[in-house]
């Protein structure tokens, strides 16, 4: 899980999701997981 100021889609499988106030990227590739912080 990377914590970044700006989250971006890395590949075409990445999806940007808002979960209880935080913006996250979920993907089939575990290294692409990100969270805005």
From Swiss-Prot:
Q: Does the keyword Ribosomal protein apply?
A: yes
Q: Which Pfam families match?
A: Ribosomal_L36 (PF00444)
- PROSITE patterns for this protein: RIBOSOMAL_L36
Q: Which UniProt keywords apply?
A: Ribonucleoprotein, Ribosomal protein
List the GO terms this entry assigns under cellular component, sorted alphabetically.
cytoplasm; ribonucleoprotein complex; ribosome
Offer one example of a GO biological process linked to this entry: translation
**Cystine connections:** none
* Listed InterPro entries: Ribosomal_bL36, Ribosomal_bL36_sp
Q: Which SUPFAM superfamilies match?
A: Ribosomal protein L36
The molecular function terms in GO held by this entry are: structural constituent of ribosome
**Keyword Ribosomal protein (UniProt):** yes
Family the entry assigns? Belongs to the bacterial ribosomal protein bL36 family.
Which HAMAP family does its entry note?
Ribosomal_bL36 (MF_00251)
The record's listing under NCBIfam families reads:
rpmJ_bact
Q: What is this protein called?
A: Large ribosomal subunit protein bL36
Report the source organism: Marinomonas sp. (strain MWYL1)
Taxonomy of the source species: Bacteria, Pseudomonadati, Pseudomonadota, Gammaproteobacteria, Oceanospirillales
């Amino acid at each position: 899980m990377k914590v970044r100021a700006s989250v971006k889609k890395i590949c075409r499988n990445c999806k940007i999701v808002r979960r209880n106030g935080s913006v996250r990227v979920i993907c089939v590739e575990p290294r692409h997981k990100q969270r805005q912080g």
